[in-house]
Amino acid sequence: MYSYKYPHPSVTTDCVIFGFDGTKLHVLLVERGIDPYKGKWAFPGGFIKMDESCEEGALRELKEETGLTGAYIEQFHTFSDPNRDPRERVITVAYYVLV
């Protein structure tokens, strides 16, 4: 039998959304609505459901939090520091989105 500090890590996605208005590059942030970071600015994202891939979860969160659909999305990094989230063990798969 094995004993792990974090036997069931959660998986989340974050979307770094880039937009270009012809002169400047912009990044879209959303205001967090729940603790522990309520009121803070963050990249749109959230927890992956058990029946979806990371990309499906990223697209779902993107639509839920921003209303965006049909944008170009590409995975670019995985954040896995065991202590990066005070709530629980979380692994985040990050995507960049071009609009």
Where are these regions (language model features)?
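Generic intrinsically disordered, low-complexity segments enriched for polar/acidic and small residues
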Residues: 1-3, 34, 76, 92-93
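Hydrophobic alpha-helical positions that pack around
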Residues: 44, 58, 62
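Active-site segment of metal-dependent pyrophosphate-handling enzymes
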Residues: 9-11, 55-59, 67-99
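N-terminal strand-loop-strand
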Residues: 2-42, 55, 70
